[in-house]
């Protein structure tokens, strides 16, 4: 019996080795391709942003930004009535955080520049060289540990003075301000930064800042929100127009002045969600397409094709600004080298244009008459979570990447944010937060979906987990935790969650598989 068992084991091992190495021996590219589609230059990283991480409020010449003012004036709008004056103090603890990155084995780190550290008053004041010095030291420290900086020029925070002087993104002057910021950053950091993005999630920033008014500058009108100023059916599109042209200005500066010598690439980051028609009716299918047009395509179509989506033009008419012939030419010659995709969740979509529809998120004109729902009847769109906007639906992520692949052929993509949020309830213990099995389940499912999309032909070049650390999560304050590392809000001590070890092992496993392929 023992000999028979040994014989069976030998046969099984031979079969496995033949399966792995025996097929297509003449082409190493095919070996283990079913196991790991990640190429050798694929970026595995974590993501952050200046306001959510740095802290160091007004330190070393930093000025007030829009979120400083918003959180100080309106603490009641933040779930825990907090702000990011201290945040997780990465400004002073970045060397410790780079050690955590090294533990994970990531080869890239996505962070953003604090506009207020570099240009406290925009073009109305001087460059703050203490801010330049900080980012130079930070970038050098990352590179010394083999971690590539992946830098966002602006992640929603900007000098409050620009809001006070000319209403920031509602004014074309903001294009000049942003171009000036970009030029300074390329000049001082571009010899080491090879991956740039201009704006983070302009579509989400526009919706929350100018449509519903939940984010600064808190502008909106009924029925979209309750604000003291603003017009939800015109201002989001005016601000978007200026953001898109500001992006093009920054890209043009990089491509004409710096790219040839610095040999980097530049793109933009948008928020995406998968929108699944709630039924097989043509009306709901068309509504799902409108939902995409009024969300991610709103930004991506202009920066890639130089025009707004047809669905937006048809519904909004003259409320949607038009690009001049010169602006179209500038957009065409300032085409992004890649796009960054932030993705967390999915929704069912119900038509509200030709059908009777309840009021709710997405149901009105400026949203495309496409109602967003988390369930149809008793069936939910994936697994619902304690975070009201996040639903676990890896299949939707797979569909989203294929949709982008088909709409923007051959455009390289980076998954610049993807992660799972734990809502900290009064009864939640630190032990429960550290034992984050639900986050592991989420990441495993979404990374599997990513691999499937890459096998389908999606040109994805990197994946960044949101986030390295628990941090200030906007209106949720510190009550929603996205980090691979737990942060004690009193001591700021960083402690690895189970997901940190899981991600470390995942990276090691796929890098090792890659090495087998490359060396075979």
Curated annotation (Swiss-Prot):
Protein name (Swiss-Prot/TrEMBL): Beta-glucosidase 45
Family annotation (InterPro entries): Glyco_hydro_1, Glyco_hydro_1_AS, Glyco_hydro_1_N_CS, Glycoside_hydrolase_SF
Disulfide bond residue pairs: 220-227, 352-357
Residues of the signal peptide: 1-22
Function of the molecule: Hydrolyzes p-nitrophenyl beta-D-glucoside and natural glucosides such as syringin, coniferin and p-coumaryl alcohol glucoside. May be involved in lignification by hydrolyzing monolignol glucosides.
Reactions accelerated catalytically: Hydrolysis of terminal, non-reducing beta-D-glucosyl residues with release of beta-D-glucose
Annotated SUPFAM superfamilies: (Trans)glycosidases
Pfam families referenced in this protein's UniProt entry, alphabetically: Glyco_hydro_1
Tissues in which the UniProt entry reports expression: Expressed in stems and siliques.
BP GO annotations: carbohydrate metabolic process
Catalytic center residues: 201, 417
GO molecular function, one term: beta-glucosidase activity
Superkingdom per UniProt: Eukaryota
Gene (name only): BGLU45
Alphabetical keyword list: Disulfide bond, Glycoprotein, Glycosidase, Hydrolase, Signal
Glycosylated residues, chain numbering: 3, 226, 378, 435
Family, per entry: Belongs to the glycosyl hydrolase 1 family.
Binding site for a beta-D-glucoside: 52, 155, 200-201, 344, 417, 466, 473-474, 482
Record EC number: 3.2.1.21
